[in-house]
């Protein structure tokens, strides 16, 4: 046969694989290598029983990399090559948690001088659990409380599709690209019984050995070392360039299932942990367990406290959970924490150091806090140079002085504090003293016939510490009210320290939420006297902001002998101004903050004792800023979660002319707090006998107050004028300030809507929404979750986290999930975002 014949050529072509055949083979081999490498990783990280040497794994890994390089379109979502990182991101996207990531209540077991634990708080926890279960006997699971970052991992059809940080518990950041670089997180779940959807909660951390190695590299590269493994893990996980994250070895340990569809259904938490391991996750084997009673739990806790230094990772306690998931459900939640779990913290770590100086810090409310400046000491995983001394009483009680050797503790492993002084190490000096000669004469007696020999005694080198009498910042007097532990600077907003801290709080995210205006800018504005009051922020313009930045940059340039930031030097040596987009962004943020929710505005004012929760209570009780400004102290004291002390603080704030003027200035500058629906009508809580019993300076029980109210004809005018009332009442009301208070109460109640009026929708309450319970689920087209919640609450509705028979509406967005299914099963009305907005009007 002629080898060059046409038939022979066709036969050769038939033997040559087509492009589609090559691609099919590549796809099959990529799938094979991906599965094989993931299995080897599972054996290595989860089972701790590798079946192949590292060199074999590396060879297969490089083979997979080469295939993916030639066929990037065939790269699988669970490919282990993703663990080396990808291209940098522009920023982290927000992620709304379908199930909030809640915190745990803390419990402490202090040790005495002999190392004996006091477990009273844990026994109290056990009793609360038993009471909640009507005497039932719970089993407990105890597991390490890792000192890392809480992370939520979402798997769909077994593949990791999203990873999010905890954030504020409701909203976190999307860190999926970085999480994929964590070696012991499965990119595809193992096993045959993988769920259709599962959200796994756990902790990302850095092992101690990896932390030491990282800091060594940082030092070798001339970079700042990390303070502790937690900071290193946090900094690594929040890198926009995931290739940097990949270089820093992070670990993950799971601790709970947030939600799940299909797959194995656990009845106990210990079964959940076993399920995690079956799915390919690592567990802290040997460091957790299930126990029959609280005494066994506490014995294991003490064992782990002793074992803590030997662990490969940092832990700051143990988490104790009721094992039965049914019992967990029965116990439920309180506020933002489960009743069925507690974080049992270890005793804080302590170390010795020397007090080099004591000075004071001035807080935004004027609180004067003495602070010990310390010789640097490594304690609780960080280098400590400052420690709080709390107040003058604490300084005096502990007798802390400059030069003292002290025990420093990181209280709760967060805030360093001075625990006690080692008095035998106190620096002393010798001083001459006058002593008796034994006959009754003294050494300093000029008429003594036989003077005694000179004698000396040791006295402390430094005098006892006393707070300064005047503020070191503004020189205003430091005052301390009777019965108060904390002394305060009397300068108010005249004090630069209070002014800066007050403005930082005012602009903060949970207050007015002024986007773009950070602490550094505010500190510069205050230091340069460009802003003195809240309203001054709303008068800022681009020239003022430019002046602030130029002055700040000039200071930096003079100290560094470098051209200032924000300018450039051309060939001629002349400075060219940069664009002012940054200033425009700040002004846009200020403008956007002009219509805050009433609760945010009240919180922003910085009223003493008024946190977010109290501010929300005030908004829900009074509805408008004007009503809050005029609310009498006895009415405030009747509201939920407020009480006498907080009520007095609120009333005192609004009684000051300068505070009212400050609010008027804000209103004049265009700030307009939104009207809030009255969902906690004062009439419901401030019944006559209750507010009468809370009148300042008049002691009376609620029963007697009720009798007084009836004697007065059940009206305030009778209380003001009836001459047949008891003489002690008549004496009280004759005082001018008390007469004014009664008049204020009469006017206030006359102008407040009744409970019925509030329920019927007066004062802006939406009749269709007031009193209704809403549940939000899924991603809405235009509204963020907190925006939708604010709109509902402003109209008088309530937002719940779970669907029940008491739910009136479920507002469903994209990927609504199990809440939508439950709503349909219970026959609860389901609304789209558009339908919600229509309902809200």
Curated annotation (Swiss-Prot):
<dbReference type="InterPro" id="IPR004150">
    <property type="entry name" value="NAD_DNA_ligase_OB"/>
</dbReference>
<dbReference type="InterPro" id="IPR013840">
    <property type="entry name" value="DNAligase_N"/>
</dbReference>
<keyword id="KW-0520">NAD</keyword>
<keyword id="KW-0227">DNA damage</keyword>
<dbReference type="InterPro" id="IPR012340">
    <property type="entry name" value="NA-bd_OB-fold"/>
</dbReference>
<dbReference type="Pfam" id="PF03119">
    <property type="entry name" value="DNA_ligase_ZBD"/>
</dbReference>
<dbReference type="InterPro" id="IPR004149">
    <property type="entry name" value="Znf_DNAligase_C4"/>
</dbReference>
<feature type="binding site">
    <location>
        <position position="166"/>
    </location>
    <ligand>
        <name>NAD(+)</name>
    </ligand>
</feature>
<keyword id="KW-0235">DNA replication</keyword>
<dbReference type="GO" id="GO:0005829">
    <property type="term" value="C:cytosol"/>
</dbReference>
<feature type="binding site">
    <location>
        <begin position="103"/>
        <end position="104"/>
    </location>
    <ligand>
        <name>NAD(+)</name>
    </ligand>
</feature>
<dbReference type="InterPro" id="IPR036420">
    <property type="entry name" value="BRCT_dom_sf"/>
</dbReference>
<keyword id="KW-0436">Ligase</keyword>
<dbReference type="InterPro" id="IPR041663">
    <property type="entry name" value="DisA/LigA_HHH"/>
</dbReference>
<feature type="binding site">
    <location>
        <begin position="54"/>
        <end position="58"/>
    </location>
    <ligand>
        <name>NAD(+)</name>
    </ligand>
</feature>
<protein>
    <recommendedName>
        <fullName>DNA ligase</fullName>
        <ecNumber>6.5.1.2</ecNumber>
    </recommendedName>
</protein>
<dbReference type="GO" id="GO:0006260">
    <property type="term" value="P:DNA replication"/>
</dbReference>
<keyword id="KW-0862">Zinc</keyword>
<dbReference type="InterPro" id="IPR001357">
    <property type="entry name" value="BRCT_dom"/>
</dbReference>
<feature type="active site" description="N6-AMP-lysine intermediate">
    <location>
        <position position="145"/>
    </location>
</feature>
<dbReference type="Pfam" id="PF12826">
    <property type="entry name" value="HHH_2"/>
</dbReference>
<keyword id="KW-0234">DNA repair</keyword>
<feature type="binding site">
    <location>
        <position position="489"/>
    </location>
    <ligand>
        <name>Zn(2+)</name>
    </ligand>
</feature>
<dbReference type="GO" id="GO:0046872">
    <property type="term" value="F:metal ion binding"/>
</dbReference>
<dbReference type="InterPro" id="IPR010994">
    <property type="entry name" value="RuvA_2-like"/>
</dbReference>
<feature type="binding site">
    <location>
        <position position="345"/>
    </location>
    <ligand>
        <name>NAD(+)</name>
    </ligand>
</feature>
<feature type="domain" description="BRCT">
    <location>
        <begin position="764"/>
        <end position="841"/>
    </location>
</feature>
<feature type="binding site">
    <location>
        <position position="495"/>
    </location>
    <ligand>
        <name>Zn(2+)</name>
    </ligand>
</feature>
<dbReference type="Pfam" id="PF03120">
    <property type="entry name" value="DNA_ligase_OB"/>
</dbReference>
<dbReference type="Pfam" id="PF01653">
    <property type="entry name" value="DNA_ligase_aden"/>
</dbReference>
<dbReference type="InterPro" id="IPR033136">
    <property type="entry name" value="DNA_ligase_CS"/>
</dbReference>
<feature type="binding site">
    <location>
        <position position="203"/>
    </location>
    <ligand>
        <name>NAD(+)</name>
    </ligand>
</feature>
<dbReference type="Pfam" id="PF00533">
    <property type="entry name" value="BRCT"/>
</dbReference>
<comment type="function">
    <text>DNA ligase that catalyzes the formation of phosphodiester linkages between 5'-phosphoryl and 3'-hydroxyl groups in double-stranded DNA using NAD as a coenzyme and as the energy source for the reaction. It is essential for DNA replication and repair of damaged DNA.</text>
</comment>
<dbReference type="InterPro" id="IPR001679">
    <property type="entry name" value="DNA_ligase"/>
</dbReference>
<dbReference type="InterPro" id="IPR018239">
    <property type="entry name" value="DNA_ligase_AS"/>
</dbReference>
<feature type="binding site">
    <location>
        <position position="471"/>
    </location>
    <ligand>
        <name>Zn(2+)</name>
    </ligand>
</feature>
<dbReference type="GO" id="GO:0003911">
    <property type="term" value="F:DNA ligase (NAD+) activity"/>
</dbReference>
<keyword id="KW-0460">Magnesium</keyword>
<feature type="binding site">
    <location>
        <position position="474"/>
    </location>
    <ligand>
        <name>Zn(2+)</name>
    </ligand>
</feature>
<feature type="binding site">
    <location>
        <position position="321"/>
    </location>
    <ligand>
        <name>NAD(+)</name>
    </ligand>
</feature>
<feature type="binding site">
    <location>
        <position position="143"/>
    </location>
    <ligand>
        <name>NAD(+)</name>
    </ligand>
</feature>
